[in-house]
Amino acid sequence: MESMERIIDNDYTKLCAAEEIGKPVLKCEICGKEKMYGRIHMCGKNIDIPVLMCDCAKKAQEEWEEQERKKKIKRNLDWLKANSHLPKAEKTFEEWVHTEATEECYKAYRSFVENYYKGSHGMLVYGDCGCGKSHLSIALATELAKQGVRTIYKNVPELFEDIYESFSGNGISASEIIRPITESSVVILDDLGAEKPTEFVRSKLYYIINSLYNSEATLIVTSNITKISDLKSIIGARSYDRILEMCKFVHNTGTSYRVNIALERESAHR
């Protein structure tokens, strides 16, 4: 059934009442308002199409779209929670403690969320430990999931441990651990470089990164390295080269908030 907007879009010749052109009287099933007929002239013939003259169909469509949007958000939040290494405490952008040293990093994360599109360039965020990279990464993952983006957050040391444990054969396989990562649109690998993996885990890491590259997924990496080149000896040349191609660099120049809190406590007790 055509709507008034469609009538305008298709530039119908005119609107006709049913009685005017000898057509059956049709009414909206919801409000009972009589429908008109939109007449177009095509191939030497008049074609009359019933047209809704009320907003019922539009309202029903909008309600359906809103329901589908909420379902999609729930699916992606459930996906994030089921497949990620998330802490119990929720991390949000609103809870972020702003400092001059970390403001550029914060802005980079917010800008990513606001401007994300499928295939967006990723980020390699590096800097001192304890300066909020994980907090911002978790907040980003949650916001993207709410936008309907399939996102996953993995703490790399925990991911490596999961892969090591898969060798025992008592749990899930390495392939099953990796599959949700390669099926996501945005993947966050947090704390890469905290430990040097075995060659087997290196190969799995490259498989993950290369799969994301081939599927045009977006990769976000955080690391406590002081120089980007330090990653090469830790994760291997192949993974390193892929990250350089997939990510822009964001340097978090902040210092550890845990150290700052400890210093404040010490100062208060003097």
What are these regions, as identified by a protein language model?
Residues W96, K154, V250-N252:
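Hydrophobic residues at beta-strand termini and immediately following loops
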Residues G119-S137:
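Walker A/P-loop nucleotide-binding motif
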Residues M1-E103, G254, A262-R270:
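A short, basic N-terminal segment
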Residues S120-L124, R150-T151, V186, T218-I220:
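Residue-level preference for the first positions of well-ordered beta-strands
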Residues E103-K107, S120, A141, A145-E183, ...:
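Short glycine-rich substrate-engagement loop in P-loop NTPases that contacts/grips substrate
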Residues F112-S120:
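Phosphate-binding P-loop
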